[in-house]
């Protein structure tokens, strides 16, 4: 088992373990040939206890003994924030855990001290968490006394209302909130409320649509657990963000998306039209770049270790590298990676080949295959695997270079370095920064469209 990514401030990193270190034994028991699950189980233990790991470091080939003290693992909910070009501040917030809003507040204050002119708040892939943390973040940007959230259930004691309770930090700083289909729950309360008050431009793709209040882990007999839904969320405009409805049928309840014909129209504070029943629709839709198939399969450590081994060798050959803001894998380094992939005999599933097989099957069924057989054969030859050619295709090459760079930055500078480096090629962030640099366009988006 090989260590992939030690996390900053966690036991592995504090003990000096690095990406690529091979675990040979734990407390004297050999781990050679053991499964990842087996090794992981032996790494776990009570916080405060210690274990002794014997590892082999690829950069030197030497075997080392390392003492590691276990502790409760808490992944960072604010893995990176920092100033970008042209006075644009960036905060990556990935989970609404207890006290996380305080870190967002501190980050915002720090960025303002550095001269921030506009903020990008990144809630992509933030699945939510504590509603109280969402309310605290909204208190930072919305005037005191404003309505933020209602919870409405079938019984009165499930109902509640929340308003801003303190003076805000800032009510004028231009803000763009980045969202995607994995932005859910408390993240949608934050982004939706900022949208309802015209306090920020929401950018990206439509959010998940989780508008239910739930009590998790209600204990049941025989070690059973129940997640109980008690109410729905309603944000200031009056809309509910829940995307699924549960329809009663003869076979029980069936979950289905709320059809557009049954959604309702609401208005923001400035009079812009917004709708319920499907998460938060961004003010500007910006789709991310798609990941090519070849890049997807090369990056999966469960199918191939080519990329991982290349990165381990790269780290061994480069004790230091450029900062995350400046680092880019060179074409010469990529060529070495390409040659390694070609020599390995690596193959992957091409979507075009799969579609061609489906088309052939359909043509046979409809009786047209024999007439078109020469064309099918010619197309099959054209689409035949050519790994070297696939790796040289400019878009594939760029995306693979970006993946390797992000992994390397995590090894040299931890997760924050990887996130900072990824902003170099982040289409959604680039559009957010561009918009914040254009005050007229930004303000126009927050005004209702003139009716014809």
What are these regions (language model features)?
Residues 2-19, 24-222, 232, 421:
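Cleft-lining beta-strand/loop regions that shape enzyme active-site pockets
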Residues 240-452:
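Conserved functional hotspot residues or short segments at active or partner-binding sites
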